[in-house]
């Protein structure tokens, strides 16, 4: 549920600052990540601000948080292979010693509205940009679509178009970058039929969407976003089989590309705390210990400027200080 950037100005500023950070960081940083454990941890690109010093700070701390830095944004950004945001994130990977995870989105999760119609011209542009990006950067991970089961709920016809299109793009990417792991991303709570809590509906397991996994036979990884704090009042309420259930629906490698739990004493009825957030971090790794997940990405290093409860999901405060959840995340394996 990471939101797209606030317009072209912010995207341009992001690129400028990232390039500046690369110049300053230079060769003093390690060229490659250390050999990694079975589950690669990481955080999304979520600095305190778009100032140069804060970007440098983010990449330095990202090495403590894990091996991966993810970027999620408008699919069209892939087309700018000179200085687009995903291009710069991929380029800085060797400088700061992380593995980039690039996630290209084509619709708005809150409404289901397409960023642009999936007509022939758009599909051609999306496909060409993804292939060019993959050919140039040979990324280890490239996701096409974020929380696509939400699109299925809001616009089944657009979802059907994407399913066919995804298969075409998958084949084209593999032709130029065969080692890239290509996949789409689902929203786990909704996949389970959990639409209650802060989603505003009711929980109904008969509305589970597990069958959608079969619509993507070419997905190299089955990936999810997960925000159980939108459904459960505290981590102790999460069922023991909450994550292990996934294995009954697929034998493919698993990944969690967004993980989050808020730390604020709001919204009303869903009050949390920093201690509770840390408790969830520990609970998540305990509940997923037997899954051999390939990726575990926390949504925000720093609190983002967005609506609640996402605005208090950072592992660190906006002032730079660490929450208890930061220590839990760093030590988790």
Where are these regions (language model features)?
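Alpha-helical scaffolding within the catalytic cores
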Residues: 50-58, 83-89, 125-130, 188-214, ...
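N-terminal substrate-binding region of glycoside hydrolase catalytic domains
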Residues: 33-125, 143-149, 223, 228-229, ...
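Active-site groove signature of glycoside hydrolases
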Residues: 129-159, 183-185, 295-303
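Aromatic- and acid-rich polysaccharide-binding/catalytic face
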Residues: 71-76, 140, 146, 198-237, ...
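Aromatic-rich peripheral "rim/lid" segments of glycoside hydrolase catalytic domains that contact
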Residues: 38, 55-58, 152, 266-279, ...
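Active-site clefts of carbohydrate-active enzymes
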Residues: 104-112, 186-193, 226, 248-281, ...
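C-terminal motif of bacterial Sec signal peptides marking the signal peptidase cleavage site
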Residues: 24-26
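An active-site-proximal structural segment forming one wall of the substrate-binding cleft
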Residues: 115-144, 158-174, 203-217, 278-291
